[in-house]
């Protein structure tokens, strides 16, 4: 049990590393005061360009993937594997390093799900791409893909710990997008420009 607790603590701390903030600071920008003010890959991309945005996406994704792979490598049960992913995700959205104010969690959730349910990620990614291609709203694509994950994971795996954690992560991703939802409804949300 000690190893599992240490893994969860490590996963949370890894998830708490504010990748976008650190990369933006290295470029001389405080991302929290630029664009949307969010520390995630979309705002970094819009503010600092493709390369820094992609680096943020990859870094945030790895924060979710590494703890899941570590738990699998250590031979932990589905419950602990799923909790390791959840801990990393919670670290990102409620980072201890920024007063528990983090990002929206999309990229970190992607990493978690790549480790937990890679086939479900492919389906959700297809949904994300279709929504963004037709609407040009990254936020709408993220919300729709998050909403699709629980039923897809339930259908493909049916394993209660994975489904439970997927529901929690999906709900939190949608909750973290509540301001985007308001802007979408008001017609003031920023569209994606490639």
Curated annotation (Swiss-Prot):
Catalysed conversion reaction: an acyl phosphate + sn-glycerol 3-phosphate = a 1-acyl-sn-glycero-3-phosphate + phosphate
Membrane topology classification: Multi-pass membrane protein
Pfam family, one: G3P_acyltransf
Signal peptide: none
GO molecular function: acyl-phosphate glycerol-3-phosphate acyltransferase activity
UniProtKB keywords: Cell inner membrane, Cell membrane, Lipid biosynthesis, Lipid metabolism, Membrane, Phospholipid biosynthesis, Phospholipid metabolism, Transferase, Transmembrane, Transmembrane helix
Keyword Cell inner membrane tagged: yes
Alphabetical GO biological process terms: phospholipid biosynthetic process
Annotated pathway: Lipid metabolism; phospholipid metabolism
Intracellular or extracellular location(s): Cell inner membrane
InterPro entries, per database record: G3P_acylTferase_PlsY
S-S bonds: none
EC number annotated for this UniProt entry: 2.3.1.275
Domain of life: Bacteria
Residues passing through the membrane, by range: 2-22, 51-71, 80-100, 112-132, 155-175
GO cellular component labels: plasma membrane
Family from the record: Belongs to the PlsY family.
Assembly and oligomerization: Probably interacts with PlsX.
Function: Catalyzes the transfer of an acyl group from acyl-phosphate (acyl-PO(4)) to glycerol-3-phosphate (G3P) to form lysophosphatidic acid (LPA). This enzyme utilizes acyl-phosphate as fatty acyl donor, but not acyl-CoA or acyl-ACP.
Protein name as annotated: Glycerol-3-phosphate acyltransferase
Provenance organism: Geobacter metallireducens (strain ATCC 53774 / DSM 7210 / GS-15)
Lineage: Bacteria, Pseudomonadati, Thermodesulfobacteriota, Desulfuromonadia, Geobacterales
């Amino acid at each position: 049990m000690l190893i599992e607790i240490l893994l969860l603590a490590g996963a949370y701390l890894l998830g708490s590393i504010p990748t976008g903030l650190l990369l933006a600071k290295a470029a001389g920008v405080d991302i929290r005061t630029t664009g949307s003010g969010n520390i995630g890959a979309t705002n970094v991309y819009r503010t600092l360009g493709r390369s820094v945005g992609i680096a943020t996406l990859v870094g945030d994704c790895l924060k979710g993937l590494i703890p899941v792979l570590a738990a699998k490598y250590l031979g932990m049960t589905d419950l602990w594997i799923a909790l390791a992913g959840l801990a990393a995700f919670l670290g990102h959205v409620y980072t201890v390093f920024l007063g528990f104010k983090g990002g929206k969690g999309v990229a970190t959730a992607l990493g978690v799900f790549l480790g937990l349910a890679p086939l479900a990620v492919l389906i959700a990614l297809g949904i994300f791409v279709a929504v963004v291609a037709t609407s040009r709203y990254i936020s709408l694509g993220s919300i729709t893909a998050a909403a699709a994950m629980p039923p897809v994971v339930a259908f493909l795996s049916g394993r209660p710990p994975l489904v439970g954690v997927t529901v929690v992560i999906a709900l939190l991703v949608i909750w973290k997008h509540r301001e985007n939802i308001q802007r979408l409804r008001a017609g003031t949300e920023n569209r994606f420009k490639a």
